[in-house]
């Protein structure tokens, strides 16, 4: 069961403006990354379903985070079917994210009032997802779809939209500012926030610092 309500999840996404995206088969590495992000000010974290036994790792992380990072909102990403969504919801996912829009996932999440953020690449897909009850839609791959200008042009006719972008998003002021100015609710970041060499070296302090910097750039762009 989800620990946080849909309202709390969306409020945290809006307040911080950033959702780190990560997967590693080593649960201890995952814990260290999540803790580093938490200490850097992150409050929403997407664990991606991208490896064998990923759901088992996620279940362990949810139990651990409840005490180690009590305000961290953990969700599951790379979910493409209703069965997998149900599995992660049972393990405590507070939100579900997918690279595509699957209308079969929406009612599974809606029944439990858990946010479902599907990947969309057009105004039609975004609006169809909204009609299915998706409060936050994800534009992916954001860089290929059209960048900040695409988001800005979507927000013109669909002013009520809450858009998350992933792909071509980097933790730099030059990159983040255009996305925020375009009107996104939040940005998702993976490899740019967690370089392989940083994770391999166990330099968790560097991840904390990078999160702090990115959140600072987002706040500045919103000011």
Please describe what each predicted stretch is.
Residues 73-75, 81-119, 123:
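Helix-adjacent hinge/juxtasegments
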Residues 38-43, 89-96, 110-117, 131-136, ...:
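Glycine-enriched alpha-helix->loop->beta-strand junction motifs that scaffold or abut catalytic
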Residues 43, 96-105, 138-147, 183-204:
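Glycine-rich phosphate-binding active-site loops on the catalytic face of alpha/beta enzymes
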Residues 17-22, 45-47, 74-77, 96-97, ...:
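Hydrophobic faces of well-ordered beta-strands that scaffold small-molecule active sites
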Residues 43-52, 84, 89-91, 112, ...:
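Glycine/Thr-rich beta-alpha phosphate-binding loop at enzyme active sites
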Residues 1-75, 79-83, 87-91, 181, ...:
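Conserved N-terminal beta1-alpha1 strand-loop-helix module at the mouth
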Residues 81-91, 124-133, 170-187:
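Catalytic cores of alpha/beta
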């Amino acid at each position: 069961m989800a620990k946080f309500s849909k309202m709390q999840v969306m409020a945290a996404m809006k307040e911080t403006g950033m959702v780190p995206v990560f997967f590693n088969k080593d649960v201890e590495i995952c814990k260290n990354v999540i803790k580093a992000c938490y200490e850097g000010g992150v409050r929403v974290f997407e664990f991606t379903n991208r490896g064998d036994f990923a759901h088992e790792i996620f279940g362990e992380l949810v139990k651990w985070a409840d005490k180690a990072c009590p305000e961290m909102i953990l969700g599951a990403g790379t979910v493409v079917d209703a069965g997998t969504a149900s599995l992660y919801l049972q393990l405590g996912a507070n939100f579900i994210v997918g690279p595509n829009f699957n209308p079969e996932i929406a009612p599974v999440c809606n029944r439990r009032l858990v946010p479902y953020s599907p990947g969309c690449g057009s105004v039609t897909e975004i609006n169809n997802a909204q009609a299915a009850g998706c409060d936050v839609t994800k534009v992916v791959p954001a860089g290929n779809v059209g960048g900040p200008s695409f988001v800005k042009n979507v927000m013109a006719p669909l002013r009520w939209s809450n858009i998350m972008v992933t792909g071509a998003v980097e933790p730099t002021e030059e990159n983040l500012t255009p996305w925020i100015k375009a009107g996104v609710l939040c940005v998702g970041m993976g490899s740019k926030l967690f370089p392989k060499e940083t994770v391999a070296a166990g330099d968790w302090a560097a991840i904390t610092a990078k999160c702090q910097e990115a959140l600072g750039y987002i706040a500045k762009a919103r000011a």
